[in-house]
Amino acid sequence: MSGGEWLEGVARVTGVRILIWHGYLLGGTGSNVYTRELARAWSRAGHDVVVLCQEPRPERFDLGGARVVRPRLDGPLPVFVLDRYEDARPKLLGQLSRAERERFVEQNAAAVRAEGPADLLLTNHVLLGGPVGAASGLPYVVKAHGSELEFAMRGDPALCAWARETLAGASAVLAGSEHVAGVLDELVGLPSTSVRIVPPGVDVDRLRPRPRTEALAGLLAESARDEPNPPERHDERRPDDGNADRLRAFLAGDRPTVLYVGKLSAEKGVGLLLEALRKVDARAVIVGFGPARAELEAAAGPDVLFTGPLEHRHLAHLWPLADVSVTPSVFPEAFGMVAAEAAACGSPPLVARHSGLAEIAAGLEQEYPAHLRHLAAFERGDADDLARRLAELLALSPDDRAAVSAAARRAVEKRWSWAGVAQSILAAASRGALGG
């Protein structure tokens, strides 16, 4: 049976066995959330799902019944950007020795084989998802996320050649946006016509507009549930200590609120947002962790609150409280999931117009009233343009604000629900069999 035939069968039925290989965690950054939500959507659709990843505490997450297997690692964890991990030793992919790379691939491939056979193996990231899939001996589909392309493969011909070799054996290659497909063509020589575009998804049942009183009460209740995280043993990957009291005080009153959710690193443009906020009468909540936090917090004024990273149980209540959600990245983004999630909650996103974020903006603009379409995006790296559009969004009349909020939600329901995305991946995989 060819790759196309067996994948077509997967797309037609339920109750099949699906393996998802993901080299990292299940919380925090975009590909982690992607893996978690896809596993849950497929599980809820009646499939038998196993997630192979490095998450040390999977019980914290609702995976809809999916099982988690953690492959044993004897060496370092290959990463694209250095972060701290609870019980893994990260090392930049480009700095790994050949022996370290081969050991990582084989240990993960062995874990995949032990869970086989499967109707579908989905591996995340061109590297190292492609090599792990190829070494597993199972038919595999590779999902490109973007971070591996920009932070590891760009400028490294050897890594690009390795990716090209392992993608050749994939049944299909998926990307979340036309931008990522274009980068794949640029770096690997894989024509964009060979890549199937399936945008990431949003849990539209959990992430929805809520009345302010309900949303604030829910946010404070979830924050009160957080485990202690005192300064003397602070874990940057967990919410800050005392967030419930801090948020209660900070969000008192009806002053306009701007929200940022994402990593705190230079390429995410948070400094640009802080610069723009100095020209706007608003308060801002900054959610996330990363190497630039101390510098950003020192540069922020009293109208800005940093919370550390929050989980979706918090964000489901925080996004509805935000008058605007800003995604100011200055570096290419594969898609911009947090912008879509904000839109699902009725919080109008304002995104930098480039890469995958431009595709988010295009989806919003198709739903926005004509006279408000210019408020979906701003010019990358332009703090003045960001400030102007942010001020205009915050000054909308009640009718226009309601129209933009409803349109943002509608854009997500039409394009980016997880249930639809999960089925689209199966269908795209069946259509995209390479050489099958």
Annotated model-derived regions:
Residues 55, 179, 201:
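Carbohydrate-associated surface elements
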Residues 255, 286, 294-314:
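Nucleotide-activated donor-binding/catalytic signature segment of Leloir-type glycosyltransferases, i.e.
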Residues 14-15, 51-115:
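A conserved catalytic-core segment of Leloir-type glycosyltransferases
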Residues 171, 258, 320-334, 347:
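Acidic donor-binding loop of glycosyltransferase active sites
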Residues 309-310, 318-322:
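Short alpha-helical donor nucleotide-sugar binding micro-motif in glycosyltransferases
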Residues 174, 217-268, 274-278:
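Conserved donor-binding/catalytic core segment of Leloir-type glycosyltransferases
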Residues 30, 381, 395-429:
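A charged, aromatic-enriched C-terminal amphipathic alpha-helix characteristic of glycosyltransferases
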